[in-house]
Amino acid sequence: PGSGLAALAHELAFRHIVLNDPNIGGRYSALSHFGLLPAALTGVDLTDLLGRTSTAIQSMRPAVELGAFMGDGANQGRDKLTLLLSPPLAPVGAWIEQLIAESTGKEGQGILPIDMEPALEAADYSGDRLFVYLRMDDTLDERVASLVSAGQPLLQISLDELHDLGTAFYYWEFATALAGHLMGIHPFDQPDVEAAKVLARDM
C-alpha cells in the first residue's frame, strides 16, 4: 500500500490489485500474498495447501522442537545447520537458507545454513554441526541413518506430498523466530540489509 506500483495500478485500472501487509518481511512472506499469488498463477491448489497447513499447525510441537533444536544447538556452539532435503523439496533449501541467515546472522553471531553440500562421511563432520532432514521420500534415508549412527544431532520433518509445503513454511518461520529468541537475537529486523539498500539508493 502506498507504493508507486500501487498508485500506478489504480491509475491504469488494473484488473486486480492485491495489497500485501507491508509489515511482513520478505523472507517471512511465503504464506502471504507475495508467495501465494505466484503459486496460484502456476496452478497450485491453494485451498488444499492452506487447508492442510491449517490442520497441521493445530499442533505446533514440530515447529517448537525445530526452533529449540536450532537455538539451543547454536548456543552450545553448533551453529552450522546442514539441510538434507528429499529431491522434490530441494528448491526449498534456498528459501530456508535466506530465512535463517538473514534472521539470525547479526550482532556477531548467527546460524549458518548449508544447502546443497556434497555428502561427507558421517565421522568427517566437526562438532559444530546440526542436521535437519526434510523428508518426502526415502532417497536420503541411508545417509541420514549413517549420520544418526555416528551420533550426529539430526531432526527429521516428514511431509506426505508437495501441498504440505505450506506447513513446512509455517514451521520454519516459527522455528527461526524461536531460535532467534533463544539466542538473544531479534529475528525480524535486518539492519545490514536495510543499510545496504540505503547505500545502493544513494549511489
What is the role of each PLM region?
Residues 87-88, 155-163:
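Phosphate-binding beta-loop-alpha motif at adenosine-nucleotide cofactor sites
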Residues 1-132, 137, 167, 171-203:
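Active-site phosphate/pyrophosphate-binding segments
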